[in-house]
């Protein structure tokens, strides 16, 4: 049995006192090293039955998917420096951000034990309310993408949606926030205020199709017919 445990390989034991992946009886378990208490590099880590790992490693080399040897020392340092306490600190920091966001967005903020989320449907509805619109000019995930662009443009906040790595959700997802990063930003209240201000800017842009198109797609240089096509098409 193979388990792709992703960040849960650390979050489960550290936060919820759950068994480690291989303690569940799995033959193989995989996780990544780029988040949730580890510091990179961004590669996969496979562990388990020695013979199975060797076979999979050989096939990875055949496909050119293996981790480059130059990354081994960085991976080793990341593993050696991992502490479950760090994961709990990240969760606590996220909880404080969630509290600050709840004070601004109320019931529209969706909170889980380890995340705070502005769901795309709620985000678009909120922006439309602030803009006084009854008909959405974009689809929900475009609202999240636009908010991500605005947060980066105005506050230097880099989110998954801007970076172009397909997330598992259309929500604006806040999780496992380093306290050092939050402190440099000015604290949880400052971050919540930044998101709120960016939602205000998003609301204004909903009434300006050209500006919204430029925000999401850059300056459109194609034919006029293509340039005026609906954003959500």
Regions found by a protein language model. Give the residues of each.
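Conserved PLP-dependent catalytic core of the aminotransferase class-I/II
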Residues: 80-130
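Conserved C-terminal alpha-helix-loop-beta "cap" of PLP-dependent enzymes
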Residues: 110-214
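Generic non-transmembrane alpha-helix signal with a bias for helix starts/N-cap capping motifs
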Residues: 14-15, 94, 144-145
